[in-house]
Amino acid sequence: DKVSVIEEFNDALKESVAETSEEFMERFFNGEDFTYAEMAQGLRQGVRELSIFPVLCGSAVAGMGSLMLLDNIMELLPSPEQGNYHKATLADGTTEEFVVSAGGVPTAFVFKTISDQYGKYSFVKVLSGSITPDMTMVNARTGDNEKLGRLYTMRGKKATEVKELVCGDIGAIAKMDKVKTGDTLCDSRKVVALKGIPFAEPCYSVAIAPKTRGQDDKVAQGLNRLNEEDPSFSVVNNAETHQMVLSGAGDMQVDVLVSKLKTRFNVEVELSPVRVAYREKIRKTVQKQGRHK
């Protein structure tokens, strides 16, 4: 029944909390219960050590679980200043702990990209110092200087222009054409590269082609723009089968990409199975006489 299921998960939660300290572990084996404050303390410690990953349920459409999510973020997640779990690679190749600091040199991490026919937005979280429009920063991946465009804070689809983003802020920078998701923008006084975002290898492939002849370049351009937003899929032109092969996590991701090509880039495509380029191996040499006409 439901009660037994709840008790089972509650016991698993207590065991996870007990593993965060020797004191809690001893009390757990002695059969003692934890108070609410002690449970919260253990969860905070586990989250900070990346040994506990809370999962919450809710629905933004139905308005369910939003307050619970915010309360748990405030109570369980460490603040950026408490975390200090960012690994940074310096220009000389050595690594160090990156310290989040409002008074440090400006550093921002690009965690998302949105690109459409009207332009490109690079979403960043400022991890140190502050950034302003027209500031010149270094892209740690390329070593190039990047002049920042206009800065925005996003609320849904509404973009509000701001004059500054400070440490801890999440915002968007316009027209950063050479910047990709996972890049670190930093001050020239201290060039650091934070660990990028790992993406799973694509495991599902289909051939993609335009419904209207002559729109291959338009399809390729649209997929390249979408790949800036979602690097988890790949596009390869197979020279042997003469097919454009789209690879992703599954058919749902492919369907979303096809829909975006139609709505945002005004190009319709059709999908087909990937052709296999069969090969035969020469196993041995033989001598044969014959007449060639």
Name what the model sees in each region.
Residues 1-293:
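Structural and coupling elements of P-loop NTPases
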